[in-house]
Amino acid sequence: MSKNHLLQDPFLNELRKEKVPVSVFLVNGIKLHGIIDSFDQYVVMLKNSITQMVYKHAISTVVPSRMVKIPAEESSGEEEGTVAD
């Protein structure tokens, strides 16, 4: 697993599991709202009144509507982190 996935995947997965509403800012400035339904290496499925497939390379920022705990990876020896809005 690449280094950036050590934060990205647990963060997105926690948002998905807890159904936290998010604002997703794209690199062109467009702001999307919704709940992360699923994601993979290349895309995030963002659900609102419809489900949108958003390519990760087009995403600038993901802002959760509330604080989210990111579970620490057991093998990394790092502390559990939090991300605040």
UniProtKB/Swiss-Prot annotation:
SUPFAM superfamilies: Sm-like ribonucleoproteins. Residues 9-68 form the Sm domain. InterPro entries: Hfq, LSM_dom_sf, Sm. The keyword RNA-binding applies. Keywords: RNA-binding, Stress response. GO terms for molecular function: RNA binding. It comes from the Bacteria. One of its GO terms (biological process) is regulation of translation, ncRNA-mediated. GO terms for cellular component: cytosol. PANTHER family: RNA-BINDING PROTEIN HFQ. HAMAP family: Hfq. Homohexamer. RNA chaperone that binds small regulatory RNA (sRNAs) and mRNAs to facilitate mRNA translational regulation in response to envelope stress, environmental stress and changes in metabolite concentrations. Also binds with high specificity to tRNAs. Belongs to the Hfq family. This is RNA-binding protein Hfq. It comes from Legionella pneumophila subsp. pneumophila (strain Philadelphia 1 / ATCC 33152 / DSM 7513).
